Amino acid sequence: MLEIIKRLEYYAKVQPQSIALQIDDEIVNYESLYQKICDCTLNSPKFKLGSRVALLNDSPIVNITNYFVVLMMDGVPCFLDNKWSRDTIDKLIEHFHIEYVTTAVGKFKRTTSFGTYEKYISEELKVDDLLHIGFTSGTTGLPKAYYRNEPSWIGSYAENEKLIHNYETALAAPGPLAHSL
């Protein structure tokens, strides 16, 4: 199990009513987030290890929830921007062999790239502990992919803790949600 999932489960047990996510006025505590993720995992299709899944909702809460659902099902979340043109999204799905798209919590639809898993598995193996794939904004052409692995994410927690222990009253994460992860 990924460390990020273990930590989410831990906080759901130890601090269930603490805020896990807050986007504008929408607040989700650890207990309800973890429960929703577990429920969705039970009721969703099973992915092959490393299957890529596009997160394509305008709600950051929905995308984060699906992010964890995909990770718990051994998939690789791919953050796409729902403001991109259909043509751009289709090109990214084809180019990066994204097999599923999700636009609602726990609802996954196969793409035209479904079943092309074997063609890109060697690329997957080049990235140790791949956690997710994000994309640049695409202002200079087709958005470029960047890969985030789990060790780099875990390392970012030490820096986040420094901010929290300085008792900051507000923190800002400019840019797209995917870049903040």
Segments from the language model and where they lie:
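Conserved AMP-binding/adenylate-forming core of the ANL superfamily
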Residues: 9, 17-47, 148-151
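Conserved AMP-binding/adenylate-forming
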Residues: 26, 42-83, 173-176
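Conserved AMP-binding A3 loop
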Residues: 29-30, 131-158
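Conserved AMP-binding loop of ANL adenylate-forming enzymes
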Residues: 55, 163-181
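Short acidic active-site motifs
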Residues: 87-88
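Proline-aspartate-enriched helix->loop->beta-strand connector
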Residues: 97-102
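Flexible, low-complexity linker/hinge segments
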Residues: 107-130, 147, 155-157, 162-166
